[in-house]
Amino acid sequence: MEITARFVREHLPLIRREYNKYDRGRLLVIAGSYGMAGACVLASRAALRTGCGYLNVAVPKEIYGILALSVPEAVCTVYERPEDLDDAIDKADAVLLGPGLGTLREHICPHVFRKGQKPLLIDADGLNSLANAPRLSGTATWS
């Protein structure tokens, strides 16, 4: 499949001038860890470039400053425990999980997998977590 300008026009919704950020969707990105903040920054910038309206990025406190300076358009949620993500997950229309999580994935991913009920894009370390614990994949109804 070739992705052309025509393909994009036919498959992505038109973004109207009168739309506000909430009309364009609320995305939660759960990404990044010490030494891998770049993955979080790249994923966040990509979300904004593709039309995300409201972007909330959940990061560990060690990389908060990097993200806040690199993606000032994003709202940042700092977490210490997996449960700290619950409110952000509940408010999101969709969740991106995984880029640059590193060893944090061992605690974060199983918790997010169990939450369910939202469109979930699993990437990078999120996929590694799912591969290492396949029984978790059936614990919730993600789209």
Protein language model regions, located:
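Short, surface-exposed connector motifs at secondary-structure boundaries
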Residues: 46-52, 91-94
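A general structural signal for stabilizing positions within well-ordered secondary structure
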Residues: 18, 46-49, 68, 86
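YjeF_N-associated NAD(P)HX repair module
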Residues: 1-30, 34
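Residues at the starts of beta-strands that form the adenosine-phosphate
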Residues: 26, 53-56, 141
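Short glycine/serine/threonine-rich phosphate/pyrophosphate-binding segments
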Residues: 35-49, 56, 104-107, 127-130
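Glycine-rich phosphate/dinucleotide-binding loop and adjoining beta-alpha-beta core of small-molecule
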Residues: 1-5, 58-143
